[in-house]
Amino acid sequence: YKKVEEATPEASTAVFYIGSCLAELGQYEEALNYFFKLDFIESNCVKAWRGIGWCSFISLKYEQAMKYYEKIIEHKPLAIDYMNAGHVAWVMGNIQKAAGLFGKAITACGTRERFLEMFHKDEEPLLKQGIREEDIPLMLDLL
């Protein structure tokens, strides 16, 4: 993808995949640069906003993460968007907002089981962000 970027630096698909690869490698700050570039190249680019939201969350930039998740929710939200926005609200200490967003994620998933499957995949990042392990079942009981 880097070679494609060298040849066509404005190729949005390459920019997206480079950002995604960097995020998968845990290079969130560098990935953010690519997602911001994609947001600049394509206006109202929800997939750029998703990348910015997640990388910002992992990088402890919670206000920035919430800003982008709120933009997504105003446009074309998926269940994962509500869930990730819920994660951000939770680590920011807004339990009521988090529970509401998780509730919307459950509705968007179609079943509680599908939501729980997605949610449990994010337990490690939640713990790294300061959510206590014993609080996870308590949050799930609220839903």
Residue spans for each PLM region:
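TPR/TPR-like (Sel1-like) alpha-helical repeat modules
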Residues: 74-77, 87-114, 140-143
